[in-house]
Amino acid sequence: MVTRLRLVSRSSRYATVKFTDSVSACSCRRLFSASTDPEPESQPEQAPPTNPVTGDEKLRNLRVLLQQNRIETARGVLSSLLRSDSTPFASPKELFSAFSLSSPSLKHDFSYLLLSVLLNESKMISEAADLFFALRNEGIYPSSDSLTLLLDHLVKTKQFRVTINVFLNILESDFRPSKFMYGKAIQAAVKLSDVGKGLELFNRMKHDRIYPSVFIYNVLIDGLCKGKRMNDAEQLFDEMLARRLLPSLITYNTLIDGYCKAGNPEKSFKVRERMKADHIEPSLITFNTLLKGLFKAGMVEDAENVLKEMKDLGFVPDAFTFSILFDGYSSNEKAEAALGVYETAVDSGVKMNAYTCSILLNALCKEGKIEKAEEILGREMAKGLVPNEVIYNTMIDGYCRKGDLVGARMKIEAMEKQGMKPDHLAYNCLIRRFCELGEMENAEKEVNKMKLKGVSPSVETYNILIGGYGRKYEFDKCFDILKEMEDNGTMPNVVSYGTLINCLCKGSKLLEAQIVKRDMEDRGVSPKVRIYNMLIDGCCSKGKIEDAFRFSKEMLKKGIELNLVTYNTLIDGLSMTGKLSEAEDLLLEISRKGLKPDVFTYNSLISGYGFAGNVQRCIALYEEMKRSGIKPTLKTYHLLISLCTKEGIELTERLFGEMSLKPDLLVYNGVLHCYAVHGDMEKAFNLQKQMIEKSIGLDKTTYNSLILGQLKVGKLCEVRSLIDEMNAREMEPEADTYNIIVKGHCEVKDYMSAYVWYREMQEKGFLLDVCIGNELVSGLKEEWRSKEAEIVISEMNGRMLGDVTVDEDLSATEKL
């Protein structure tokens, strides 16, 4: 029969100990109530000598104290023994074993006392767990309070694996764990990211009719939210309500955070509304979580509404709130708004810490506002802020982004003057910028500088260099860097190989890219989906669709799921090669895999069908996009408007009117070209006027369309004024413009005017299109302008553009 004993009393700070030696029940009761029944001596009891010579003497002293029922003295001696550096026992477990051998009749009493001291006075939690397992092997079982305390301390000291093992050991006995014990075990499982184990224990406790607490539900909901299992988290929330448990503020905050991180801020709002209905007052954490999620989703206006509600309810933003606002406005490219928040914080007397300040500085640096960043940093330093490495690195990166490498170096010097040693992150900013500029020699000089300063290049440093040389297609240097990394003991990672593979694919070196992939696999670095996507994209861009699908099959064979980027790349490759039926099959497969097509998916299909001349299918795909809630991009409208020109003005105008985006030059030119092709020059010139009013810069394509339209409606004399306007805008006409003009005159059979324009074109060194040249020569000969025709033929042949063919009848006439 397992011995059980209450070790830690709820009403006393002392352990309750059951003695098996000849100690009276009266004495025991006195000992267990030491706080209310003091020992009879008026003077504090003196412990035996504290420096016995041997371990045996220490054990004998403890045995005597226990036999004399002097529990508190024994506790003090035991606590000192455990803390002593000169203790003869390697561990508490060894101490227990030694005591058990010397005093077997007291081993139960001693075990309880030892466990109590380990948990309470000494806080030796790992040793307490080891002792627990040793006691179990001896058939000794601690009390419920002892186990509760042990599990609680194990969780607090983050010994989650041990917590689970102790609890499973408890389950294996005939001991009935308490609700608190289950809670600690479930908490440990969730902390280990093993929500499955937590749910298993959760179901076990319900089976044993131990009803979970709000704490346990909160722990599991938190674990499910962190794993983005929001449906399961919702089910647990509903179960709480069904059991008439009132969700706490923590419950609601956890769900709000989960939905935000899962990219579903709309659901977060619903949880917030549920809080209001249940009269649960929000906390600052509630609002901070909502703000972070909304900014992440790009819902800036909604975030600002939440901020207003927060202030209306009397909440004062803290440093973390300001960090969220700075980061949120930054990620949504609203640095000016971030500056406004900063001024509000200053006016409110909020003191910026280094973390919050670094986020604001990063926002400004990303948008190239390095001068403003310096101004704010100066203001904060005047208030006592001491810049740390993060702030300096942020500023160095800001200078590098703007191309001010002198300013970046000055910041490095400022770091050194402040006693900080710039690390690889600081130097990487400079190295990256030189690589972006293609100045690899300067990049290498920076690497040498950091080495001289005692800073070893990091994997990221080498990866930056690989990318720099790769973009210049200097692949031999890339391989040299890989070798240098290995020689220095810096193992290339997935990014190292991925950077090189990507550059090789962009440089049409597909064979070499595959060799690098095999090399990384041989070195134990497994390619991820991103690397496979690079290879697939490289194959598709070269029209090697079969090779692309070979890689996709290899992915599946290795258990790597195809993601949306993979499918989009394959669909784009199929669409470019006219294999539209196969592309549509992949579109269906995307949905079957639980993925959602995006705008890139549809743009590829629209482009493919457009190239095939199937405008109706393009429009159908566009309508399907809208029904699915996918917002078209400017590229979508570029494709559709250029394709719909032949379909007429009405369809083009409908597409133009449906745009929720600000039209760019390509869109305006597409619509204007449609008007010109269909001869509606009034609308064409009105649109040109609108472009000028909206500061949309006109280009040669704009004027080419206007010239084409004027020629279409027979206003040949107006063409010269458009050419003059182009010249006034320093937009000198080139070959394409002159070809349009010559062809336009030929189409209305004004061949001599066409010839005049040809002469101007020729004098400026531009070449006439061969087909247009044939048309011009034929027309000139029809009008008996053989001399001009011969000049055109001679000049075009002289330009090595091939012979200009004319009808045999015209040739015969020429001979006459």
Curated annotation (Swiss-Prot):
GO MF annotation list: zinc ion binding
PPR repeat positions: 108-142, 143-177, 178-212, 213-247, 248-282, 283-317, 318-352, 353-387, 388-422, 423-457, 458-492, 493-527, 528-562, 563-597, 598-632, 633-662, 664-698, 699-733, 734-768, 769-803
Signal peptide interval: none
Region (Disordered): 34-57
Alphabetical list of SUPFAM superfamilies matching this protein: HCP-like
Lineage top rank: taxon: Eukaryota
Subcellular location: Mitochondrion
InterPro entries for the chain: Pentatricopeptide_rpt, PPR/CCM1_RNA-binding, TPR-like_helical_dom_sf
Range annotated as the organelle transit peptide: 1-39
One GO CC term, this protein: mitochondrion
Record's keyword terms, sorted: Mitochondrion, Repeat, Transit peptide
Family label: Belongs to the PPR family. P subfamily.
Protein name (record): Pentatricopeptide repeat-containing protein At5g12100, mitochondrial
Natural source organism: Arabidopsis thaliana (Mouse-ear cress)
